Amino acid sequence: MKISVLTLFPEVFEMYLSQTILQRAIELGKMEYDIVNIRDYARNKHNQMDDMPFGGGAGMVLKPEAYWNYFQENFDFYGKENLNEEDLDGENNHEIGNENEDFKSENSKFKKPHVIFVTPQGKTLDHQKVMELAKKEELVIISGRYEGLDERVLEKFVDEEISIGDYVLSSGDLPSLVLLDSISRIKEGVIKKESFETDSFYNGILGFPQYTRPVEIDGYEVPEVLRSGNHAKIDEFRYKKAIEKTIKNRKDLFEKKILEDEKFKKEYEKLFYGKSK
């Protein structure tokens, strides 16, 4: 799988890619990353990437030309024509945005990446979406900045907009790293299967509490059952604690799980109330 990130600050990604689980994914041949300085694709005198918004307003908006050039130079699906600032001026904006529609529909053999724009206006990322994205052959993540990205880029190239939460950051670089990490770690072999299967959200609920040495600190002890060696009791304890944590911290997840998973509902009733049908 290949993931490309279009950013104005590629150096943000360098250390993370070289020292984390993402590096392991590279070494195992599970992932390929391309961190692109999108400014390199600008076609103006000073490689300017931002400009004032039409209609007025605070802040600056990322210009569209560099994104057009990136996609058309790197993917046959979009054609090869480079654009400069003048190409997007005047009354021909619509034509430029749609000029390759026939080309795309008639040439499906040309690869098309799945393109994501990370933005607080997108749908909130969850484990199910990460699993879905991990099945794609190639992703391109657009990392925004300033007040936003020219809407024509979204209309032309972006397949979906994704948010990592209902708050605003200075740029899309951190959300892009979140996507890189969350997708890479579930690729087969990158982490142990046992670790992946005990992650929060894997089974629709949060993960169970973890403990390590020492057994006691300042009066707080590791639960005795975890030291018993009885694996059946340990599994039951962990499952119950995971449910309790989900009810406490993410009641929405618990209620969804109860409604959609009859087996889980019966297990919950038996574990907490001794009911068995």
Indicate where each model-derived feature is located.
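N-terminal nucleotide/polyanion-binding subdomain common to many enzyme families
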Residues: 1-75, 227, 233-252
